[in-house]
């Protein structure tokens, strides 16, 4: 068994990381841009979200298809259980967030854009649903900061404190 994830899994992991940064930055920094740029910034956010959704589903399918490389030295069962729980939360979060965002945008009942394309929208707006979905989307996005921070801290703890190969399994291979 390989001691690293596949190149595809590693590439998708880091691409999702970059897309999450872009999606978060689009929303956090949009106030620094003129209002006339908001549609473009929103389109970037939505396009990143759709890309994250697709890539997270692909990651999940790859994770089911390929065995997870072993952590060496093997951690205690409780640590393994916590890692599985953490990964479950990450997958659920970064699949649910884009789905909620897409359903929210659809229910606004007006044109919206992703990848430069006009996306389908409801013939009649449902603002009550939009408000509820927006609240969930924002709450989960804020939770995402904590989950990402915890994920990164755990990877660094594995590398520097427990001195195992957890972090190295997801790092790109060195060129020969």
Swiss-Prot record:
Induction statement: Expression is 10-20-fold higher in the logarithmic phase than in the stationary phase and this pattern is not influenced by the presence or absence of oxygen.
Cofactor: heme b
Keyword entries, A-Z: Cell inner membrane, Cell membrane, Electron transport, Heme, Iron, Membrane, Metal-binding, Oxidoreductase, Transmembrane, Transmembrane helix, Transport
Positions in the Cytoplasmic compartment: 1-7, 65-77, 159-176
Function, as annotated: B-type di-heme cytochrome. Catalyzes the oxidation of superoxide to molecular oxygen and transfers the extracted electrons to ubiquinone through the two hemes. Can also use menaquinone. The enzyme may be responsible for the detoxification of the superoxide anion produced in the membrane or at its surface. However, it can also efficiently catalyze the formation of superoxide from ubiquinol under physiological conditions.
NCBIfam families linked to this entry: PRK11513.1
Protein name (database record): Superoxide oxidase CybB
Species whose genome carries this gene: Escherichia coli (strain K12)
Record lineage: Bacteria, Pseudomonadati, Pseudomonadota, Gammaproteobacteria, Enterobacterales
Designated gene of the protein: cybB
């Amino acid at each position: 068994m390989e001691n690293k994830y596949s190149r595809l899994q590693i590439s998708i992991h880091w691409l999702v990381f970059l897309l999450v940064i872009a999606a978060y930055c689009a929303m956090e920094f949009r106030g620094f841009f003129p209002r006339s740029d908001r549609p473009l910034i929103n389109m970037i956010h939505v396009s990143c979200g759709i890309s994250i959704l697709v890539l997270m589903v692909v990651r999940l399918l790859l994770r089911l298809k390929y065995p997870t490389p072993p952590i060496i030295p093997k951690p205690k069962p409780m640590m393994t259980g916590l890692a599985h729980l953490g990964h479950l939360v990450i997958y659920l979060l970064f699949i649910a967030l884009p789905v909620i965002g897409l359903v929210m945008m659809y229910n606004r009942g007006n044109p919206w854009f992703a990848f430069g394309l006009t996306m389908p929208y409801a013939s009649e707006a449902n603002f009550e649903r939009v408000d509820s979905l927006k609240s969930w989307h924002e709450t989960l996005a804020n939770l995402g900061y904590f989950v990402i921070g915890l994920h990164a801290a755990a990877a660094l703890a594995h590398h520097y404190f427990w001195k195992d190969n957890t972090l190295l399994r997801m790092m790109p291979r060195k060129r020969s």
